[in-house]
Amino acid sequence: MDLNLLKSWNPQLQKNRKKVYEAQQELLKSARKPADDGTSGGGLDWMYEGQPAPQRKVRKRRTRTRKPKQVPKDAQGKLQESLQTARSDAPEGTCSPDETAAARGGQQGAPVEVSAKSPAKAVAEARGGPGSSGVHGE
């Protein structure tokens, strides 16, 4: 650039604003151009441009291709019998929720004591501070 041009640069002049605007538009176009090419796949793709793509092995999900496990018929019969005896031995609906809680060690049906005092009053009375007697200045 010419030194005289730098000295006479005035941002208020229309021709100078136009030059700045055109330069900014040119920068924006050059920044958008690589994005339009579709080469923004990844950061390391430029390193592998000349090399052939690696071949991937086809993986099959085992759960879809695996056949169900074959159980011998005598083992299936024993399993069915044990399930039926377990179901028949269990009493149906004989235990109440209170009995099951008591068997676990809890007390589900025990009444809960509810205090009529507010928590703030209880704390004030425990401290012996103002508000415990209800009269200020005693």
UniProtKB/Swiss-Prot annotation:
Taxonomic lineage of the native organism: Eukaryota, Fungi, Dikarya, Ascomycota, Saccharomycotina
Name this protein carries in UniProt: Pre-mRNA-splicing factor CWC25
One of the Pfam families matching this protein, by short name: Cir_N
Organism field: Eremothecium gossypii (strain ATCC 10895 / CBS 109.51 / FGSC 9923 / NRRL Y-1056) (Yeast)
One example of a Gene Ontology biological process annotation: RNA splicing
Disulfide cross-links: none
Region (Disordered): 28-138
GO CC terms of this entry: spliceosomal complex
Main location: nucleus
Functional note: Involved in pre-mRNA splicing.
Entry's localization field: Nucleus
Chain intervals with Gly residues compositional bias: 128-138
The entry's keywords: mRNA processing, mRNA splicing, Nucleus, Spliceosome
Assembly information from the UniProt record: Associated with the spliceosome.
Family: Belongs to the CWC25 family.
UniProt KW Nucleus keyword: yes
